Amino acid sequence: MDDSIINLISGILILLGFAGVILPALPGAPLALIGILVFKLFSGDCSFGWEVIIIAGLFVIIGAILDYVLPVALTKKFGGTKYGVWGSIIGLIVGFFFPPIGFIIGPFVGALLGELLFAKKDMNLALKSAFGSFVGFLVTTGFDLILCLVLFGLFIWDIFIN
């Protein structure tokens, strides 16, 4: 297959990875990694070694683990109960149907409602644990975004500069 077609497919996968950082239906950083892997395997334009793919893969795995662990851990660290954690998860799922703002505020609102309605916490404590959920979301989203930017940068560097 022609390198330009492979490069186009790789670029589309990487761009879909960026979309996946915001849209929960798409696996963001893993899609970008697949784009880089396709580029490495099938394009004659690729000059970086397998160690780059392996390191990127390790960061994708770390990011995937953080996506599930960090929001829950920070919700608990900020005083959240299991109701806040479950509310955050449900808020994330509900927020999926109202992109992109729903994905951003869904976990926060879910954690807040979980704490208020089921844990019977006052507004200040509920807001604190919901804030923990929101901070976890921001950190993991930022990590995935930076990872996708690095992978995109590698791709662009190899095609246009190298």
Predicted regions and their residues:
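Hydrophobic alpha-helical transmembrane segments of polytopic
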Residues: 6-13, 56, 147
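Transmembrane alpha-helix interface/packing and boundary motifs in multi-pass membrane proteins
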Residues: 14-31, 91-101
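Juxtamembrane boundary at the C-terminal end of a transmembrane helix
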Residues: 149-162
